[in-house]
Amino acid sequence: MTITAPPKDEIISKFPGSEPLLNFYNELSDAEKSKLFHQISTLNLSEAHQWFIDSADQRAPSTAEDLKPVLDSQHFVQAELHQVILDGLWNKGMDAIGRGEVCAIVLAGGQATRLGSSQPKGTIPLGINASFGDSLLGIQAAKIALLQALAGEREHQNPGKIHWAVMTSPGTEEATREHVKKLAAHHGFDFDEQITIFSQDEIAAYDEQGNFLLGTKGSVVAAPNGNGGLYSAISAHLPRLRAKGIKYFHVYCVDNILCKVADPHFIGFAISNEADVATKCVPKQKGELVGSVCLDRGLPRVVEYSELGAELAEQKTPDGKYLFGAGSIANHFFTMDFMDRVCSPSSRLPYHRAHKKISYVNEQGTIVKPEKPNGIKLEQFIFDVFELSKRFFIWEVARNEEFSPLKNAQSVGTDCLSTCQRDLSNVNKLWLERVQAKVTATEKPIYLKTIVSYNGENLQELRHREISDSALESDHSINKFFVV
């Protein structure tokens, strides 16, 4: 039902600061007026003005003396742990899954604009699986289904379910919901009981002076409020999730094709250390611009490369590792109690400024497409809550096995579809080598079915078998394991 928009003067009176957004109000159709009025009434313009002011008043810049690596007692490297310890962590994580205590939250609000698509990034075809679930969300749904099956097979283990919470944005919610519904039906998930879909807020964009911008004569320029928008967006759902028995959250970005959703090792590690917050990281590479997980004035924080500076960023330890080498990959563990605390209205995160090129309608009604940054979008960062942690830990994993994001168009050549396909194939080959299968296939990538193996298990039947192009095409005892 369309809401009838009130007169222009009434809107200005009710929503201070909205007057410049109504310059062309009298030229709009009734439907366009209603749409603009709805947008103005939901963007919280009065608070947005204050957010812009506050975003310029951030903490004092950190100095080299302020920044220290996270203590060794809080930083564990998975590859350095004995298999017996890893098995124990896996079992502890699987126990939590079996009891239905784990919720996986995927941050899926982004569109695949850089990839040349208007679809949500989590739904675009990957060119890997021709049958079903050929998307990032499809791979992740299959991993959840497999973990649930593995939990159900364990002796004395309840067949627990992993709750899947999907954070979208206003521009991606409808398409993402339909995609996830199909995945849920395919894997036997109860969509209403096991899946929560919720949308992060949008915030108006600004020019450099803090004025709001029109994208068209009848719409305000607005954008999702960053991955830190998770906390305000999910807060209303926490009581229901707690009532379901959820105690632990695994939060991850949709674009990482190698993400181990609800990773039992990671969850078991965090539970064993009584962590309220834990984060996965990978060793940083030379010149890499990802943030570093470190201590800033004694509190855990992710510090951007630009803030570290080249000298600190390149500093090494006696054993040749980067001193600030814990590269953040936006992959986190939180307890329910911690989420309750940081999602309360009194724990609002700060906004950070991002200078962007923003197309807008000028006072003459002409659309302006700038060639350089001309405006500001505000974002909240998911990791800004780290400093509120009472027991913070890092879980360092192998980049080649757990981190390959899909961010760029194919023409860029890095973090693009072909590198994701390559890295997924390489992980699958690594698993096959560990069971001493002989991989001789060379014509195409090797993709194990996601539902077959989560972490290289269930592949003993392929021990000493030759994985060749012909075997993948015609030998059912082999090709039943693979996407062919």
Curated annotation (Swiss-Prot):
Residues reported in the UniProt entry to bind substrate: 227, 407
Positions annotated to bind UTP: 107-110, 121, 200, 226, 255, 377
GO molecular function, one term: uridylyltransferase activity
Pfam families in UniProt: UDPGP (PF01704)
Gene3D superfamilies according to UniProt: Spore Coat Polysaccharide Biosynthesis Protein SpsA, Chain A
Enzyme Commission numbers on file: 2.7.7.23
Reaction equations catalysed: N-acetyl-alpha-D-glucosamine 1-phosphate + UTP + H(+) = UDP-N-acetyl-alpha-D-glucosamine + diphosphate
Keyword check for Transport: no
SUPFAM superfamilies, per database record: Nucleotide-diphospho-sugar transferases
Pathway: Nucleotide-sugar biosynthesis; UDP-N-acetyl-alpha-D-glucosamine biosynthesis; UDP-N-acetyl-alpha-D-glucosamine from N-acetyl-alpha-D-glucosamine 1-phosphate: step 1/1
Protein keywords: Cytoplasm, Nucleotidyltransferase, Transferase
Subcellular location: Cytoplasm
Keyword field contains DNA-binding: no
Motif (Substrate binding): 107-110, 304-305
Gene Ontology CC entries for this record: cytoplasm
Principal subcellular localization: cytoplasm
Family according to the record: Belongs to the UDPGP type 1 family.
Official protein name in the record: Probable UDP-N-acetylglucosamine pyrophosphorylase
Source organism of the structure: Caenorhabditis elegans
